[in-house]
Regions:
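C-terminal motif of bacterial Sec signal peptides marking the signal peptidase cleavage site
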Residues: 22-24
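A substrate-binding/cap region within the structured catalytic cores of diverse enzymes
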Residues: 110-237
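C-terminal regions of proteins
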Residues: 31, 229-235, 250-315
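Zymogen propeptides
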Residues: 50-51, 55-92
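Bacterial N-terminal signal peptides that target proteins for export
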Residues: 2-14
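Membrane-embedded segments
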Residues: 74-100, 106-118
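Solvent-exposed loop/turn segments at secondary-structure junctions
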Residues: 73-76, 104-108, 162-166, 248-252, ...
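N- or domain-start disorder-to-order transition segments that initiate the globular core
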Residues: 26-65
Length: 315
């Protein structure tokens, strides 16, 4: 389902039409749970100024950043369409970012590089070579992004920590990770107490309240390992700018990937975006800020989209 590559302005217009009319059939999945007439849908909120901005204003800001983090709800096709439009617009503005994917693990990078050195692969060929297409991620949602990066010969970087590494960390704790690597990633230094409490709560909720003993703490350590690894990969792309395709939790400034980017590259210009599913009962952007008391603002921008209806995994 690779879509043709179009210039940034045309792609933005096509995106606006697409998200209003066809997203339900684009994936074969459920349609939007919130109607397209929600007053926030497809609007962008600058959380720094407290003002709505146009897509062009947002894209101009993104083009001026060294690292752009696009935080998604993984299963929402509106979010992937928005990410694609942002990447296309950056290319149209003369930027050539490395595209870093949370969905690919760092030990897959040699396979990506070898395949691209041998020929110009299709997105499906790259997915097959890396195992992306049968990894549990919804490959059709990510195919257009990978195809766009390949079409423009942008670097494609596997950003995440290897699954064997994170599984061992959750099972056996930090002793499973080589001490020097743990220190190099800055993981020997604790999070701010408010961030630690928030992350533990997120992990407990994500496991439907079942996280006995120190299990939630080990899940937090695995989350931090993923965040630090993605930051390391992004900085390793220098001098190229980067775009990170990731879940919104990893894109947070208060405890996600930006925390490590700012520590290791304090002069780098970051832009963090949360793609937000609207709530029918919340029409004020302030209702979506998700700020934790005592911690930095989590996102620079909020881009509102319809929500998708899906079953509660805890029921």
């Amino acid at each position: 389902m690779t879509r043709p590559i179009r210039p940034g302005a045309a792609r933005l217009a096509a995106f606006c039409a697409l998200v209003v009319t066809t997203v339900g059939c684009a994936t074969g999945g459920p349609g939007p749970a919130t109607p397209p007439e929600h007053p926030l849908n497809h609007r962008i909120w600058d959380a720094r100024s407290g003002q709505f901005v146009s897509q062009e204003q947002f894209l101009d800001a993104a083009a001026g950043a060294d690292h752009v983090l696009l935080g998604e709800v993984h299963v929402n096709p509106y979010h992937h369409a928005a990410q694609e439009s942002v990447l296309a617009a950056l290319v149209a503005r003369g930027r050539r970012p490395a595209v870093v994917f949370e969905m690919m693990e760092r030990d897959q990078q040699p396979g990506i590089d070898a395949l691209r050195a041998a020929r110009r692969p299709t997105a499906d060929e790259l997915a097959e070579a890396t195992g992306f297409s049968d990894s549990g991620w919804d490959w059709p949602l990510y195919r257009p992004l990978v195809a766009l990066a390949l079409e423009h010969e942008l670097p494609i970087l596997a950003g995440n920590a290897p699954i064997d590494e994170t599984r061992a960390l959750v099972k056996d704790g930090v002793d499973s990770i080589e001490p020097e690597r743990w220190r190099t990633l800055g993981l020997d230094r604790p999070l701010a107490p408010a961030a630690q409490v928030a992350l533990v709560d997120i992990m407990v909720q994500s496991h439907c309240g079942h996280a006995p003993g120190d299990y939630a703490e080990r899940l937090v350590e695995a989350q931090r390992l993923r965040d630090a690894t993605m930051a390391e990969v992004m900085l390793g792309a220098a001098p190229a700018p980067t775009v990170l395709i990731t879940g919104s939790g990893h894109a947070r400034r208060d405890f996600g990937v930006p925390l490590y980017l700012e520590e290791w590259a304090p002069d780098a210009r970051l832009l963090t975006l949360r793609l937000v599913e609207v709530d029918p009962g919340a029409i004020d952007p302030a209702d979506y800020r998700d700020t934790i008391v005592g911690l930095p603002r989590p996102f620079d921008y909020l881009w509102f989209t319809p929500a998708l209806e899906r079953p509660d995994p805890c029921e």
